[in-house]
Every structure is written in C-alpha cells, then in structure tokens.
Amino acid sequence: MNKKQKNKIAIKHQFPTGILVFDNKIVFKGIGLGHQGTTTGEVCFNTSLTRYQEIISDPSYASQIINFTFPHIGNVGTNNEDLESDKIWTRGAIFNSEITSPSNYRALKTLDEWLKKNKIVGLTGLDTRSLTNFIRDKGAPKGTISNLSLIHI
C-alpha cells in the first residue's frame, strides 16, 4: 500500500489532521488520533514489537514523544494490567499504520480510546522509518505534535 492509499484509508475515518514539527522547522505530516491537542517533548524511538502500553507508562519515557517503529501497534488493545506504573509518563505517541481493532480477550479499550482517556496526543500515518533515521542522526531532537482538527495542511 502506498502513502496516498494509506492516507485515504485514515482520512475516511475522519481523524483530525496532525503534524510533527521540529525546532529546525522540519515537518512530518500525519493523521491525528488519541487526545486532541498539542504537546512538546524530546522525540525518541522505540523498536519493540509489543508492550506499547507498558512503554507509554514507563517513567524512563517521561516528557518524551515516542515514535514506535513497529508498524502494527494497537492490535491487542489495552487493559488495566499491562502498565509499568500508575501514571502515564509519555507526552505523545507516533505510529506508522492506522490502529486496528483489538484482537485479544484481555482488551478493555482500543489503543485510540486509551490514548484519549490518558490525554496522550498521537499521530499515525507517518513514515516512522524515515523519522527514526532523522532522530538517530539528530540525537533525540525536541519536537511538537498537534492533532487539533483546526489544522489544515
């Protein structure tokens, strides 16, 4: 599936448009999800295939925006047991592919619902490999993500 097709799929679900902007004015465009808002933090990446809920609640990611490199994040949903702490530490989350419906008997919420409940601003539909290379080369730069529906790109 090419980028144009992927964006058409995400747009048909009417998520607000979103962007990631770095201090050096480099912009990545995506589709917003999770809590509608704007947040700023150090942008890092995580290459794990699983444990996205634990990663978002891990204190070592305090005040960071996490770029998840694995393309299928969210397919097992979320629950109340898979947390690293009682508090959500991450400021934002970035995903490659549209979040799918959960397929796990333990799922209580979709990842999108859980992000909204915990006020985590998210983006999907970004080229996370390109973003990871940028982060690797720049050393976890400061960035801002916004998925307010008022943004027109």
Regions inferred by a protein language model and the residue ranges of each:
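Intrinsically disordered, compositionally biased charged tails
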Residues: 1-4
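Phosphate-interaction motifs
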Residues: 6-114, 131-132
